[in-house]
Amino acid sequence: MDRIKAKINELKQKLDQWNYEYYVLDDPSVPDHVYDQAMRELIELENAYPQFKTNNSPSVRVGGFVSEKFNKVKHKRPMLSLSNAFDANDLRKFDQDNQNASVDLKGYVVEPKIDGLSISIIYKNAKLHQAITRGDGVNGEDVTSNILTIKDIPHYIDQKYKDYEIEVRGEVYMAFHDFYEMNDNLEESDKKFANPRNAAAGTLRSLDNSIVAERKLSAFMYYLVNAQELGIKTHYESIQFLKDNKFKVSDLIVKVDTIDEVINQIDRYTKVRNDLSYMIDGIVIKINNLEVYDEIGYTSKFPKWAIAYKFPANVVSSQLLEIINDVGRTGKISYVAKIKPILLDGSIVEYATLHNFDFIKEKDIRINDEIKIYKAGDVIPYVDGVDLSKRLANSVPYESITNCPSCQSVLVRENDEVDQRCLNIYGCKKINIEKIVYFVSRNCMNIEGMSDAIINKFYDANLIKNVADLYYLQKHKEFILASDFKIKDKSFSNLINSINNSKTRSLEFLLTAFGIRHVGPNLAKKLAKQFKTMTTLMHANFGELTNVDACGEKAALSLINWFNDDHNVSLVNQLQQVGVNMEYIDDFIYDDNINIIDEYKNKTFVITGSFSISRDEIKTILEKYYHAKVKNSVSKKTDYVLAGIEAGTKLEKAKLLGVKIIENEFWKKDNNF
């Protein structure tokens, strides 16, 4: 059982990290099918071992996060994600479930699944009032000013609807030709976008709407949320409403009568997908009859009346010209295939990841082989295997490198890991540069203007050798402006301002920026919330660390080893001396208008289920405003159980014991949420 629980926790940590990369960083590190496979494995394990299923599992949450850059807005109706189908059997099961729930589906509507960023647009008095990203499904980001720059989205709808509040949902995307043009026009020091989806998401989240307008985003609308209020009875009729009101709607949308016709549409979409001017990664199937949606129902994560069929990854073949070796910030050695340029998913591909030498050996990949590749979410595609029928007669197996490609140190494998590593972590130039690149990145200290190219130039000029040196760049101003760095006075001032702003970031960002092995952004946030200060964390023992949710033995040992290293202790002290914040800053803002209900004061609470805010935040409200005690288990001494979505066994026990239950909706109403 311990092994099963550990596997479930491992999958949850991976999926949480991948969700963060996809929704917050707009920079996924794994392809969709790897994510989907992990999610399916998690769901299967949780179904088989329900005692290990928690309410904060990725399997019951809508993917996504709310950015700190924009105002947070609560959706009037949750923006749920869709369950996935991967073959005809999944679609037939979806159909059978629908037939069992309702006899009047009125067929299905089949739509392209646009690979972009979901958006909800609200019209009041027939005028565009507000635009909100999906976010975490409950709360999104207000991006109204940016949406107003997109030509596909009308600012007004027909005046006959001025007495209605109309909510329309769709997908913001970037067409291939606009994506290529934008990447070509980026400054040399700017990071290129990996793909149109990343470009669309990153652009829509820009704080400068002139940049949004310049980059030419597009949008398809596909859902009229309050169609029934307008007397519309079918989803296909609501699509016509969108067309009539000048919204851009895909001309690939069709209505069919049976699930067999839906399955036939897969072939149709597969044939046209590579000829489209935009990226699609599947099709969406919705029941046509709007009047049965509530009858068929919802889970906490997705509607049961719709499903997404995901295309398998596109696989193409190209010749392997060379294997390139590199070293990353942790000393890990990477193997990258340089291939004959080939078109894949709308972009020219010249490189593909080979992971490590064991992967090359297992697949028996050789120079000049014809290799199969597929596009992942990242810039570099993945290698799927070798076409042995095209192997040259004189080919020889590839030999592993034994020395670091940067500093020539002898490579080692630690604890039987598959990865080779350079252990010269303080003397290797490439490792030091990659540490700085990671430190300044968006999900770390977010120092804008410090591009990879500038970091390399500053390193070669001995201006920065470690991350602490960044905070002394101001004193080198005259030298930098006079040198051949192509940095002007205004750019330098902006860079220094960004460096100074980074000093005020909360502890979890600094902890992430250190790049400690096994400590990603999610765990860093939990550690910061638990220990509050860098000093307390530095002195935490193994038991205290592993008591933190999601901090396993590997992460705990890695933290202890990192803080026991004199180089790292010195670095922390240097950063503290220049004024970098070393404390956790709570980003939860309490509402001064919370109603204080006297009957809740000084009582004992148990919290179960999911809410629009975290349980820690609810616990803080109860303790701060009600002086309540919050316990983990229900007993006869429990006064109230606060029950959210998908409440579990604690709710059942409360009912058996006769404990008072506060439902989520009543809690929100009582507290002005």
Curated annotation (Swiss-Prot):
Residues 595-673 form the BRCT domain. It is an enzyme of class 6 (ligase). It comes from the Bacteria. The keyword tRNA-binding does not apply. GO terms for cellular component: cytosol. The active site is at 113 (n6-amp-lysine intermediate). NAD(+) binds at residues 32-36, 81-82, 111, 134, 171, 286, 310. It catalyses: NAD(+) + (deoxyribonucleotide)n-3'-hydroxyl + 5'-phospho-(deoxyribonucleotide)m = (deoxyribonucleotide)n+m + AMP + beta-nicotinamide D-nucleotide. Its EC number is 6.5.1.2. Pfam families: BRCT (PF00533), DNA_ligase_aden (PF01653), DNA_ligase_OB (PF03120), DNA_ligase_ZBD (PF03119), HHH_2 (PF12826). One of its GO terms (molecular function) is metal ion binding. Zn(2+) binds at residues 404, 407, 422, 428. InterPro entries: BRCT_dom, BRCT_dom_sf, DisA/LigA_HHH, DNA_ligase, DNAligase_adenylation, DNAligase_N, NA-bd_OB-fold, NAD_DNA_ligase_OB. Transmembrane segments: none annotated. Its cofactor is Mg(2+); Mn(2+). Keywords: DNA damage, DNA repair, DNA replication, Ligase, Magnesium, Manganese, Metal-binding, NAD, Zinc. The keyword Magnesium applies. GO terms for biological process: DNA repair; DNA replication. DNA ligase that catalyzes the formation of phosphodiester linkages between 5'-phosphoryl and 3'-hydroxyl groups in double-stranded DNA using NAD as a coenzyme and as the energy source for the reaction. It is essential for DNA replication and repair of damaged DNA. Belongs to the NAD-dependent DNA ligase family. LigA subfamily. This is DNA ligase.
